[in-house]
Regions:
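Juxtamembrane helix-capping/reentrant segments at transmembrane boundaries
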Residues: 41-55, 121-134
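Membrane interface segments of multi-pass transport proteins and intramembrane proteases
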Residues: 119-127, 156-163
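Internal, non-catalytic "lid/hinge" segments that mediate substrate recognition, gating
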Residues: 126-151
Length: 351
């Protein structure tokens, strides 16, 4: 049975790869035709200016690929290998649908952001508070869905220790979901980076979902991995298109949704460590700059004289400024994700 489940997942990942890779042939020229190009802000590395006009919303490649491949894979599983009386995962289909809907809704926020940038020519897109409000509502809805699907635990699970925080679990999880999903968005700043790291994180989540018998959700995770691989055909340096916020918010949403299904919060942090460090570098940079600027103002009365810890944030830009090539950054960050992913799998397997 497990051999057949493994075969189905391989088929799902290959199908997602093919759909994503081939869809770029039609999607990229179309995005160029309607002038959906990237606007490069002056605050980024100067050499990124050459990427001005590169099509955005390429994330539709792996969004469509992962949804279609998951649906096909689940249909095959349901028709030929699903035992109604001995379901391998309680409420598996509903959990799968919940993850998909959550990811699509997050992607819709990203689409609105991309649309405003590309069509309205407003470089910053949606305002931060607008994104936060929509993300908050979607996260609350997802947690409510999980609750009615039977996931009523309010314990923080750190593998070898867990503790119940009661009603405070829900606001904490909303904050964690918003933080990590936006962290994935921040990781999309170098050609191929977010896609490559996500391939690794989704493969890790696939394995963990298989271990804990969340087989339906594991199908979605491996479909995203395959879709991202297909997208990388067009996104590795020099990128022919970018995933845009449409894609990165979809990946962020899917990562937190699938991670919450595993109900292992330590593994969420370990597997998503690259994302978390990317966002943390921004928090540290901004906080330190504001603190030192405030201290300088108190001493001298001059404004805007803050100091920076990194040459630029998120941290992948710091490495760029230090002379790392985009390829080297992608390989290094992906290797870090691979190491943390393997550690997570070993920990889960030995619990």
């Amino acid at each position: 049975m497990l051999d057949m489940l493994f075969t189905i997942r391989i088929g799902v990942s290959v199908l997602a790869f093919i759909i994503a890779a081939l869809s770029g042939i039609a999607l990229i020229p179309y995005l160029k035709k309607i002038n959906f190009g990237q606007t490069i802000l002056d605050i980024g590395p100067s050499w990124h200016k050459e990427k001005q006009g590169t099509p955005i919303m390429g994330g539709f490649m792996f969004i469509i690929a992962s949804l279609v491949a998951s649906a096909v894979g689940y249909t095959v599983y349901r028709l030929f290998y699903f035992d109604v009386e001995n379901s391998l995962a309680a409420n598996g289909m509903l959990k799968l649908i919940s993850c998909m809907v959550f990811s699509i809704l997050f992607s819709a926020i990203g689409f609105a952001d991309d649309y405003i940038k590309a069509v309205k020519k407003q470089n910053l897109g949606l305002r931060a508070w607008q994104k936060m409000v929509f993300q908050f509502l979607i996260c609350v809805a997802f947690l409510v869905a999980l609750y009615f699907l039977g996931d009523k635990s309010t314990e923080i699970n750190l593998m070898f220790i867990s503790f119940d925080i009661g009603i405070f679990y829900y606001p904490l999880m909303v904050l964690v979901m918003i933080y990590i999903s936006n962290a994935v968005n921040l990781t999309d700043g170098v050609d191929g980076l977010c896609g490559s790291v996500t391939v690794v994180t989704m493969l890790a989540l696939t394995t963990i979902c298989m271990i804990i018998k969340e087989y339906e959700v594991s199908m979605y995770a491996i479909a995203i991995a395959g879709g991202c691989l297909g997208f990388l055909v067009w996104n590795l340096h020099p990128a022919k298109c970018f995933m845009g916020d449409t894609g990165s918010m979809y990946l962020g949403g899917s990562f937190v949704a699938i991670s919450l299904i595993t109900h292992n919060h330590l593994l969420m942090v370990l597997i998503g460590l690259v994302y978390i460090l990317e966002a943390l570098s921004v928090v540290i940079q901004v906080s330190y700059f504001k603190f030192t600027a405030w201290r300088h103002f108190k001493k001298t009365g001059e404004k805007g004289k803050g100091k920076r810890i990194f040459k630029m944030s998120p941290i992948h830009h710091h490495f760029e400024m230090c002379g790392f090539s985009e390829y080297k950054i992608v390989i290094t960050f992906s290797l870090v994700a691979l190491v943390t992913g393997v550690i997570s799998i070993v920990l889960q397997y030995n619990v």
